[in-house]
């Protein structure tokens, strides 16, 4: 199945701003060499929050391998949706509950490999912990401490739209955990059901197969345009991609070729959560709410559409938002907040800043 490359060249030119060449990784998994050329293999780590046995991650892994990449999977043993960037490690040396869908039995080691593919690993922890297990244990101990060129997380079984869900999602959490380690990363999210890969359809119109191809097309284009650079993406920057309803889950039945466009997280469609009390059950549930803060544009290109609006209303388009792990407020807004704290809070003496020369 051929996928459209509309907007993909733009992805490389806009998101691949010049990397700070003075930065170099200090451990084996931080990116500390140039992006490989065509005559050498690119190493990609795949992770997610829906478990190592989900149809989405297995289809993505297989598709990346078809392209000739050197691919490893380090993913949670069990479903870990909604864990954000939390870092939960195994409490025992064995699996108390087994792995998702019985893909590893109760009592199996808390981390282990697929019996048919030693590049596929599960880990009894959250997504951020699982990908770090790859960086700090599995790759150094069993795979010659190979340098990772890119981490891809997902595709998630559910959209991750807007700034609130960005902090909540385990898929996004694995992405920004990797970015903070100096490893370029992309989070992918779709909207299909939790499906065991062994029971998944092989049809070309199956959503997991379309998501795998669409995600791989974005990865392939990005790596092609990044050849010879110090890093696939600028340090501290990641991509958050949301894929629309496609194939067998698309009500129109027409979307098999989602077209990627640039978006931002905040905007007119962006939402956050609120509590809603149910008088019948006496319990709370969550609902959606918009605020001035979800619409605010403080960083980035304010003329881009927001990802929530694009995915909910634009049809067969994928949203690609460029995100940063530098959470400090922009200079003018930071100065205003600092001014409002005058009289008590002081600035550090000259020479105590975070960057050379401060």
Curated annotation (Swiss-Prot):
EC number: 3.1.3.2
Organism domain of life: Eukaryota
Needed co-factor(s): Mg(2+)
Residues bearing attached sugar chains per UniProt: 20, 27, 32, 92, 145, 199, 278
Entry annotation: catalytic residues: 189
Region (Disordered) location: 21-41
Any one Gene Ontology molecular-function term assigned to this protein's record: nucleotidase activity
Keywords on record: Glycoprotein, Hydrolase, Magnesium, Metal-binding, Secreted, Signal
Pfam families the UniProt entry points to: SurE
Catalytic activity: a phosphate monoester + H2O = an alcohol + phosphate
Signal peptide: 1-17
Keyword field contains Cell inner membrane: no
Function noted in UniProt: Probably serves to scavenge phosphorus for growing cells.
Family: Belongs to the SurE nucleotidase family.
Protein name: Acid phosphatase
Organism field: Yarrowia lipolytica (strain CLIB 122 / E 150)
Gene for this chain: PHO2
